[in-house]
Amino acid sequence: MSVSTLPLAPETTTVSGPGAYAAATTASPAPAAAPGTPVQFLLGTHQPHWLTTAEVPLFVSDRRLRSYRTLPRARSPWALDSGAFTTLSLGHLFDPPKVYLARVRRYRDTIGHLLWAAPQDWMCEPFILAKTGLTLGEHQRRTVANYLQLREHAPDVPIVPVVQGWTSTDYLRCADLYLAAGIDLTAAPLVGVGSVCRRQATTAVHAILDCLHRAGITRLHGFGVKTLGLRRHGHLLTSADSMAWSAAARRQPPLPGCTGHINCANCPRYAYQWRQRVLGDIHARPASVQSALFDLPPAPVT
C-alpha cells in the first residue's frame, strides 16, 4: 500500500551511530524549567466553532476545519493539528504539501490568531508502522522531508518541525536528519515531539524529553498529553495540547444543567471546568514538583 505522495528522502541521509545531538547529551544534565516560564497549554477540541468564543488557547484539527465554507474568527490564540495521526491510522493518503499549505494560509488569514501549524509528520508507534509497512527510519525521513517541503513552499507560514521515533536514540537520530538538512533544532522556537501520547505513564517519555533537553533542544511541544503526562513531564515542555477532557466526559453523565446531550464529550462548559481543575491540582502541588507548564490563569467556566 502506498501511503505517501512525498518523494523518499535519500537513504544516505540516515544517521547511524551517535550523531551531533547524541554527542551533546553527554555534556550536562538538562536544566529544570524555571517557575514562571511563559508557556502555553492548548485545549484540544473537535469543535472549530469554539474558536469564536474561547478565552483560552485551543488546538484544532485541519480534518475538522477543512470542510468549513465559512470559517470562524478566533477570539484567542490557537494552533493547528494537521490530523496526520488519524490520516495514517485510517491508511489514507496525505494531501500534497501545497494543498495543505493553501488551507493553512486560509486559516491564518481568515480565522486569525494562528500560533503555528503542525506538519504532515509520520508517527512511529508500532501499530502505525504495521499499517504503512515502512520502517521507523523511513517514517523519520518522510517527516523531515515534509517539513522541508512545507518550509520551501511557504517560508511565511509558521510550521513547526516535529521529531519522531520510539526510543531516545531514535529521536536524536531524527534531530540529526534535520541538522543534515540544515535545520538546527536547538534554535527552533518550538519543536514538536511525536509518538508519545499513548505512553505517558512510562519512564520512556521522560527519558525522551530529558534526552532532547540535554541535546539542547529545549523548546518542546507535547502532542496529546494526558493528565498524568501533564503532571509527570510538564516541566520539560514549553507547550502541550490535550483532549483528555473529552474521553473523561464520555464515561460520565452530563454536568448538572447540561440537558442537550447524553454526555459532555463535546461540551465547552465541561472542557473549561476540566482545564481549571487540572491547572488547580497542579498548582496545588509542592513547588519542588510543580510543573511550570501550567502557570496560566484559570479559564472562565461558561
Language model feature labels by segment:
Residues S2-A145, A299-T302:
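Non-catalytic, usually N-terminal nucleic-acid engagement modules in DNA/RNA processing proteins
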Residues P72-R73, L90-K98, L114-P119, R151-P155, ...:
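Low-complexity, flexible helical/coil segments
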